[in-house]
């Protein structure tokens, strides 16, 4: 992906985040993001532990 495509992608993400942040659904989005953060944190830690122990090559 070229740098211009990356810049366009991050621009779109920032516009969507700005729209969600300046409307009333920001609290709901924050709750969903918090839940997803903890889910992916647990998945990361489990895979990290498995990678360091069981699946060592």
UniProtKB/Swiss-Prot annotation:
Subcellular location: Cell membrane
Residue spans crossing the bilayer: 6-26, 35-55
Record membrane topology: Multi-pass membrane protein
Claim: Magnesium is one of the keywords in the record: no
Top-level taxonomic group: Bacteria
Pfam families associated with the record: DUF1328
GO CC, alphabetical: plasma membrane
Coiled coil region boundaries: none
Alphabetical keyword list: Cell membrane, Membrane, Transmembrane, Transmembrane helix
Keyword Membrane: yes
Family under the similarity heading: Belongs to the UPF0391 family.
Name the record gives this protein: UPF0391 membrane protein BBta_5399
Organism: Bradyrhizobium sp. (strain BTAi1 / ATCC BAA-1182)
Phylogenetic placement of the source organism: Bacteria, Pseudomonadati, Pseudomonadota, Alphaproteobacteria, Hyphomicrobiales
